[in-house]
């Protein structure tokens, strides 16, 4: 019977090419992790802003603003223009 040459020996790369491939994979993995971290950071930022907004709405729920205008996609978000002394003061950096 004839012996077949192994596929790995026919498609093997020089050691330096394999090292470059590993570097590219590690770079891509690092980029993917950075992208995921950026997305989580932005989601957390939005979450904090929403919590601050809800707390302000709860605190000032009995105060009627002078005018309310729709803002955002499909008018789902509302922005109330209030006198400066009525506006909620948030703690921390947003």
Swiss-Prot record:
Region of interest called Disordered, as start-end residue ranges on this chain: 1-26
Gene Ontology biological process terms in this record: negative regulation of cell population proliferation; shoot system development
Listed Polar residues bias regions: 1-13
Primary subcellular site in the record, as a coarse category: membrane
Sequence segments annotated as region (Required for DVL/RTFL small polypeptide activity): 28-59
Bilayer topology: Single-pass membrane protein
InterPro entries: DVL, DVL_RTFL_regulatory
Deletion consequences: No visible phenotype.
One Pfam family linked to the record: DVL
Spans traversing the lipid bilayer: 63-82
Entry's family note: Belongs to the DVL/RTFL small polypeptides family.
Its job: Small polypeptide acting as a regulatory molecule which coordinates cellular responses required for differentiation, growth and development, probably by restricting polar cell proliferation in lateral organs.
Name of the protein: Small polypeptide ROTUNDIFOLIA LIKE 1
Organism: Oryza sativa subsp. japonica (Rice)
Phylogenetic lineage: Eukaryota, Viridiplantae, Streptophyta, Embryophyta, Tracheophyta
């Amino acid at each position: 019977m004839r012996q077949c040459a192994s596929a790995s020996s026919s498609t093997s790369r020089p050691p330096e090419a394999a090292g470059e491939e590993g570097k590219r994979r590690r770079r891509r993995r690092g980029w993917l992790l950075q992208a995921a971290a950026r997305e989580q950071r932005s989601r957390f930022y939005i979450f904090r802003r929403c919590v601050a907004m809800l707390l302000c709405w709860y605190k000032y729920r009995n105060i009627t603003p002078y005018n309310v205008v729709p803002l955002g996609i499909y008018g789902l978000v509302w922005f109330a223009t209030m006198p400066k002394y009525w506006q909620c003061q948030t703690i921390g950096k947003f």
